[in-house]
A protein has these predicted regions:
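Flexible hinge/capping segments at coil-to-helix
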Residues: 132-148, 152-174
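Hydrophobic hinge/microswitch elements
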Residues: 110-115, 179-237
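N-terminal winged-helix
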Residues: 4, 61-103, 107
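A late-sequence structural motif
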Residues: 236-279
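Short beta-strand->loop
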Residues: 134-145, 222-224, 231-247, 255
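A short LG(V/I)-centered, amphipathic sequence patch enriched
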Residues: 14-31
Length: 279
């Protein structure tokens, strides 16, 4: 079946370029003078295509490229910085780091060409995200499981004793991000409802540590933090015994049969930083 297709393709070429590539006889086909010239040019073109392809692959190998969507997680930010430090010697560097919620992170991976997204969600939402990712061909890797803690100044009265009742927090000032919502519906009986008259709403995340560092009467609900971040800002994480809401950080990426070296390296660094957090 292949021979007739080849003959037809040759005839189409001859008609398209107005040349005769082969002389046909009962014993076979012999290239004409025009045909030999055409074949030599075609071989040169193919060699050039191979060269361009190899050059493109070489340049791609020299470019450290990574696009990752992350929640507001200090350990993930540290992993991103570690990745940049290791990739700094690359001839080319193309890295996109975007802060995103879980659904937004999924959108960046599925529709916007991002390589990885770290999702953060409550344990009871596991089935939803598992089915969502399975239907869309996304691989999942759990990075961390944790409970929210109280993040306070080391000199705060809250740092010196265990808090057993939310009412104990009413005389302190809560620092919270305007876009941050702890698990549980508005008005639910979960432990997050504290004195609404003593709150600082933060719209610029970098100021949160400065506020806690300078205001011993302030606190915020926080996920695990690297020890060096706590030491740098003179902070401590305190367990709240009545708080048993389990959270998960899960990394997702397209299940395409393998990871690029940059993706493997970032995941390695992310797991390393997760292991160093104070939970």
């Amino acid at each position: 079946a292949a021979q007739p297709n080849v003959s037809k393709a040759l005839k189409n070429l001859e008609e398209e370029y107005g040349i005769r590539i082969f002389e046909r006889s009962s014993t076979g086909m012999i290239p004409t003078e025009q045909g030999r010239h055409f074949i030599e040019q075609a071989e040169r073109v193919l060699r050039e295509v191979d060269r361009l392809d190899a050059d493109a692959r070489r340049r791609q190998g020299e470019c450290a490229e990574l696009r990752v969507a992350l929640p507001h997680a200090t350990y993930a930010s540290y992993a991103a910085v570690d990745f940049l430090q290791q990739a700094a010697g690359s001839e080319q560097l193309q890295v996109h780091i975007r802060e995103a919620g879980s659904m937004e992170g999924l959108d960046f991976v599925l529709r916007r060409g991002y390589h990885l997204a770290l999702l953060r969600y409550a344990e009871e939402d596991e089935d939803y995200y598992s089915r969502y990712c399975a239907r869309r061909g996304l691989h999942r890797e759990q990075i961390m499981e944790f409970e929210y803690r109280l993040l306070v100044n080391r000199d705060s009265p809250l740092a010196r004793h265990e808090v057993h009742d939310l009412a104990e927090l009413n005389r302190y000032t809560e620092v919270l991000h305007d876009d941050f919502q702890l698990p549980g519906e508005e008005g639910s009986s979960l432990r997050w409802q504290v004195n609404e008259n003593r709150r600082v709403h933060v719209y610029e995340r970098c100021s949160q540590f400065s506020i806690l560092q300078s205001l011993p009467t302030a606190y915020m609900w926080a996920s695990p933090r690297p020890q060096r971040a706590l030491e740098q800002y003179h902070l401590v994480l305190k367990k709240f015994p009545a708080q048993n809401q389990r959270m998960r950080d899960v990394l997702v990426y397209p299940d395409k049969g393998g990871l690029r070296p940059e993706e493997e390296k970032f995941i390695e660094l992310l797991r390393r930083q997760a292991a160093l957090t104070v939970k």
